[in-house]
């Protein structure tokens, strides 16, 4: 797994959390990655760790008649925000071209993964990617972040990136380049913006 700026102690802590999830909920984590500013490539010293994972239950869970909860969310602490989606839910979201899940699959910070399963899942992305949905998702995100983060008298530099990144993703999609990369630097490099 690539390090990408996450120190060994934090990686160990994340892996320990994932092991606890597996034991507590009787699931198997197939994939775990970093989302948010660390995955986008512009974490600040006070950034938390947004750990996202995909998991499967034991076979008997899938034989129940009543629908079961398909999300695992741990209480957020000062450093860790850990949340996962059940595998069937993830497949449905991928089929619906969910940009958030597609970003997770492109994260440069991977804590653990089942290589064979993830290779098959990633191979589905190009056929289910929807430029229309991606454009709308990123445009809506930029608008929401602009309203939430850039309206005060003092704005932290990092908050501008929360607006710029989705706008660059919109440009990427509108240019017909396919799935936008998760990393801000890649989006910027591929944006073909003219210098001032």
At which residue positions do the language-model features occur?
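Helical scaffold of the NTase/Pol beta-like nucleotidyltransferase catalytic core
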Residues: 1-33
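Short, well-ordered loop/turn elements at secondary-structure boundaries
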Residues: 27-28, 47-49, 157
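Catalytic metal-binding acidic patch
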Residues: 36-77
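Short loop/turn segments at secondary-structure transitions that flank enzyme active sites
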Residues: 57-60, 97-100, 144, 169-170
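A basic- and aromatic-enriched beta-loop-alpha substructure that forms the phosphate/nucleotide-
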Residues: 64-141
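Conserved nucleotidyltransferase catalytic core and NTase-mimicking acidic/glycine-rich helix/loop elements
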Residues: 122-196
